[in-house]
Structures are given as C-alpha cells and as structure tokens.
C-alpha cells in the first residue's frame, strides 16, 4: 500500500467535506446562460449540411445566427479568446455564391462530396492553432502570440469547407481540469455559472452546449475532450492515438509517449455527427477506423463498472452517476448486447497507475518558470503566496499541477514501476476484451463541481487512465435534461484501438435512451 497516497487522500476527503457548505452556498443560485431561442441553433451538423445543400438555409444565415448567439452568451461564460467574425462572414458569403453557381450547373452534390462540411461554422480550442488568431494558450509570457498556420486537424476541417469562427479558452498550456488562467480568466458552465466547464477544452464545451457552436476542434491528453463534454452535456470523442493529426498543437513535447497520450478530437451536441467529424478531421487515416462499417449491437459485449477504484486517494463516485451507468448497461442488454459482469480489478489503483505513467514523460512544461525570464524558476511557496494574495503569474491549479508532477503523489520509484507494470497488463487485457466490446465507466466522480473545488481534481484519473492506456473513448450525457438544480451527468464508453466505431455506435444508441444534449433552460 502507498501510505503517503492514503494520507493525502484522507486529507483531501476531510477538506472536501469541510468545504462542502461553502461550495453549496456558491452554487445555490443556479444562474444559467440566456435561453436558446433560435431553432436553427439546435440543428445537428448533418441537418445544417442538408439544409445548406438544399438551399433552405444559407451559410451566411447560419453563420450570422451563431455569431449572434456567441455575442449573447460569452459575457456569461467567458469562453472566447479571439474571434474572426468578419472574415467568417466573408467566407460564408463566398460559399453561398459558389453554391448558387453549382446549383445552376447541376453540380451541387459534387460540391458536397468534395467538401462535406461546406459552409458550416465551427469553433477551435486555442491550443489547436488557427491561422492569425491568438495562440497564447493561457500563458502571460505568450500574450499576443498569433498562430502562423492551422493545426493539422483544423486544416482538415477547413479543407472540408468548415468556417472557423474563433479560438476558445484553455487553462495554461492545457494543463488543468478547469478552464482558467491569469491571461483570459475563467470559463463558466452554461448550466450553472458558478460551476466548472471542465478542462482543458472547457471553452469549446461551454460554447457548444450554450448553442453557440455546432461543433468544435478540441484536444485530449488526460480527458480534456471528455471531461468538459461530460460537464456540459455533450458528446466528446477521444480517438485512437495517431488517427487525427496533432501537428501544431501547443504544448508540444518531445517524449515519444506524448503523441500516444495526446489526441485531437471533436466535441458535438449529437452523437450521430461524430463519424462525419472524425472522418473529416482524420483525413486519409479515417479509413483505419472503418467508420462506414455497420455495427450490430447484438454482437457487442458490454462491460461496466460504476466505480473503477478502491483507492482512498479518490473521492467516491456520486450515487447518481453510478445509477446512470447501471441504467445504461441494462438498456444495452435490452437492446440485444451481451452484458458481462466481469470486473477489471486492476482499476483498483486507477489514480496511481495514471499518475505513474503520465508523469513519466520527460519534458512536461515547468509552470514555475518566470514569464518575464524563462531561465529563472520561481519558488513554489513564494508563487503560491502571490496567488493567495491575488497576484502571481499562474492559476492555483497550475501550481497544483506542478506539485503533482514533481511529487508524483509521493510514490516511490519502485511503486511507480509496479503501477506501470500493472498498467501494461491492464492494457493487454482490455485490448483483448474490448476487441468486440465496450466498457462503460463514469466520465468523472461527480457532475460539474463548483469553480475552484480542486479537492475533487483527482477524479480526472477516470479519463486520464484511458489516455495512458492508449484507447479510444466517447463521453456521452446520461440524463437529459438534467433534473434541476443539477448539471449534466455523463459516462464514457471505451473500446480497443481502432474500434472507435463501437464507442460511437453505443453512444448513438444511448442517445435514444437518455435524450442527448439539452440546452440550458
């Protein structure tokens, strides 16, 4: 047993309990973004494409509608870092001109075969790089820096006809479970403005769930697509590593494990849109996923776990989330899936395995470097004192990330090696079991926590583990609309490498049961 982990876990549990009344007071008002009035903003990506192609809806009209909604909700959620509204409108008008000509020439279908997202607006996580827009990734030392090129996934979406509207907020260098930084401030959950939108793709999730974007290009290194999607009632897919290009992503690490842990993926409001978005974002690699191959749910084996750990270093999963995982598993059984009661006991040390493998990367960014002089490292305690007094160059969670990275949960070298060995065994076991199946697991220990409730940050281990296992996974909402005063609850659907289509097929089926995305109010 890792005794220091146990002690730290006990302290966090006690502290979380002591602070619970304070956070309850902060979230009791349950303020939300303004209601979504424009019915066009509820359309799926597929429906937008269909209506643009038929001429029922113009690219300019839908782009204008999304811009108006962004301007309406951003003062509440603080998700936008920099926009390109004028350029987007110009591009939309040009698309409409080209489509009118294609209709006259009888080539409208050809236009959409070449560009399957032609005229559809979308948004981009700042770290994924959009030409000419901010690329500071929440860091004071990079304030004013602009992206010189599009990131690989963004370039693929633009080549498919997508029209980018803006870049959205992230924590410093994407190293956080909450989207906050000293440069751009804190992004808020549209379902309850006193709660977290998750991280590190919280800006994307907050916009999309507000009805301010049909889909977004985001990234996931420890749950950064799935956790915000879960907190905001959306579908977020972390693909098999290497499928979608990560070129241009900030930060970039040289360690070989980085390209296995980091993936770029879509966040969307409708599960049915995920295959189309994956196909576009992946480019030529999409064929490896066989997304067009039908999935017979009767041949899919379903495993499920309501709690993946007995580690005292983690706070227990909420009862509501456990019940939803069981409900999802039973529904899939009723749909003809084979339901397995086998449990993967290796998950007992999910936190220790995740941390041991993740922090084994060699060049993780040092959040204590002085923004004014990167050769100087600031003292952790002095910087913490500055932050406590309302100053400092980093957010609280950036400093907590530094503590976690340097301490590695105070695990000994021998313990870390043991946990990495257990992780390898679990990976081999899951790759075999999930070759024709999926594993249902909570996406987090709770629904969206109050802003700043860092005592619950360890819950990110549920998503981080999937990254270090190098597996694909989809976050899916499991109660829609969430019963007031709750924020959305979600689970994640995990499968073996290159079996992404199984995750998505199950997510689409569960959308029928739980209702999928439901906007605030």
Place the predicted regions along the sequence by residue:
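An N-terminal boundary/leader segment
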Residues: 1-93, 97-100, 317, 327, ...
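Structural helix-boundary/capping segments
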Residues: 1-5, 72, 209-308, 326-338, ...
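Acidic-enriched catalytic cores of C-N bond-cleaving enzymes acting on peptides and small amides
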Residues: 2-23, 269-289, 313-348, 365-379
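Short helix-loop capping/hinge segments that flank enzyme active sites or metal/cofactor-binding pockets
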Residues: 24, 28-32, 36, 117-140, ...
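Serine-dependent amide/ester hydrolase catalytic core
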Residues: 46-53, 310-313, 366-469, 502, ...
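Short, well-ordered beta-strand elements within core beta-sheets of diverse protein domains
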Residues: 48-54, 123, 141-145, 262-269, ...
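Immediate post-signal peptide segment of exported/extracytoplasmic ligand-binding proteins
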Residues: 95, 99-120, 291-303
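Short glycine/serine-rich loop/turn segments
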Residues: 115-262, 305-307, 442-455
């Amino acid at each position: 047993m890792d005794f220091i982990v146990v002690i730290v876990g006990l302290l966090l549990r006690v502290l979380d309990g002591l602070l619970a009344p304070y956070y309850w007071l902060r979230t009791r008002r349950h303020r939300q973004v303004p209601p979504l009035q424009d019915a066009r903003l509820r359309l799926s990506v597929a429906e937008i494409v269909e209506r643009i192609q038929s001429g029922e809806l113009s690219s300019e009209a839908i782009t204008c509608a999304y811009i108006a909604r962004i301007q309406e909700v951003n003062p509440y959620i603080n998700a936008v870092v920099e926009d390109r509204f004028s350029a987007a409108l110009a591009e939309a008008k040009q698309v409409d001109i080209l489509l009118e000509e294609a209709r006259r020439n009888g080539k409208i279908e050809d236009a959409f075969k070449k560009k399957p997202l032609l005229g559809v607006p979308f948004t981009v996580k700042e770290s994924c790089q959009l030409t000419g827009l901010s690329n500071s990734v929440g860091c004071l030392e990079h304030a004013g820096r602009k992206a010189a090129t599009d990131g690989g996934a963004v370039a693929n979406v633009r080549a498919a006809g997508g029209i980018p509207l803006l870049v959205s907020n992230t924590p410093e260098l994407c190293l956080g479970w909450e989207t906050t930084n000293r440069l751009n401030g804190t992004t808020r959950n549209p379902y309850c403005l006193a709660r977290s939108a998750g991280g590190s793709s919280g800006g994307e999730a907050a916009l999309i769930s507000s009805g301010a974007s049909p889909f977004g290009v985001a990234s996931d290194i420890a749950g950064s697509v799935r956790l915000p999607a879960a907190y905001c009632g959306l579908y977020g897919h972390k693909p098999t590593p290497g499928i979608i290009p990560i070129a241009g992503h900030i930060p970039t690490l040289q360690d070989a494990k980085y390209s296995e842990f980091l993936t770029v993926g879509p966040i969307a409001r409708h599960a049915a849109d995920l295959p189309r978005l994956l196909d576009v974002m992946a480019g030529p690699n999409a064929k490896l996923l066989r997304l067009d191959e039908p999935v017979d749910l009767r041949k899919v084996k379903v495993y499920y776990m309501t709690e993946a750990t007995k580690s005292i270093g983690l706070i227990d999963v909420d009862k509501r989330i456990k019940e939803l995982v069981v409900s999802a598993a039973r529904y899939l059984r009723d749909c003809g899936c084979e339901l397995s009661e086998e449990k993967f006991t290796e998950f007992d040390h999910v936190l220790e395995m995740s941390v041991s493998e993740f922090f084994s990367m060699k060049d993780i960014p040092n959040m204590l470097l002085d923004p004014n002089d990167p050769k100087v490292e600031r003292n952790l305690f002095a910087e913490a004192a500055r932050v406590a007094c309302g100053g400092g160059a980093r957010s609280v969670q950036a400093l907590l990330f530094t503590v976690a990275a340097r301490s590695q949960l105070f695990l000994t070298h021998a313990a870390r090696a043991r946990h990495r060995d257990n992780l390898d065994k679990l990976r081999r076991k899951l790759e075999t079991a999930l070759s024709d199946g999926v594993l249902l697991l909570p996406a987090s220990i709770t629904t969206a926590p109050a802003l700043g409730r860092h005592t619950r940050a360890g819950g990110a281990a549920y998503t981080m583990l999937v990254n270090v296992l190098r597996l694909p996974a989809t976050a899916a909402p499991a109660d829609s609309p969430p019963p007031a005063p709750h924020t959305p609850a979600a689970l994640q659907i995990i499968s073996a490498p290159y079996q992404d289509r199984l995750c998505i097929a199950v997510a689409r089926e569960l959308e029928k049961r739980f209702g999928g995305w439901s906007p605030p109010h």
